[in-house]
Amino acid sequence: VEPILSPCSGTVERIITKEENHVHEWEKLLLIKDSKGKIIDVSIGISGVITSLNVSEGQEVNPQTVLAILQADLYGFGSD
């Protein structure tokens, strides 16, 4: 189980994924608008299933905010 933390302080602009979705490495999960107005893509470097989404659109977040929980795949995919 992997917590997905916010990479910055800001506001959740858009939630792209849903609970129970299988996501791939580096797939966009959410968009956060930081304090300077820049849109930050949130992704994670492992694949798995989103077991919990802990935020909603418009919510204020900071680097300690757990955005979602991912159950990592037991097998890896990769490319060289």
Kindly give the residue locations of the regions a language model identified.
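Short beta-strand-turn/beta-hairpin segments enriched in glycine/proline and small hydrophobics
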Residues: 1-9, 28-47, 72-77
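Short histidine-centered loop motifs in beta-beta connectors
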Residues: 7, 13-21, 51-56
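Short phosphate-engaging motifs
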Residues: 11, 22, 49, 60, ...
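Preference for bulky hydrophobic residues occupying beta-strand positions
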Residues: 15, 30, 42-44, 53, ...
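Hydrophobic alpha-helical membrane-insertion signals
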Residues: 16, 54, 62, 72-80
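A structural signal for short beta-strand/turn segments enriched in small hydrophobics and glycine
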Residues: 20-29, 58-67
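Short, charge-rich amphipathic interface segments used for partner binding and complex assembly
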Residues: 44-63
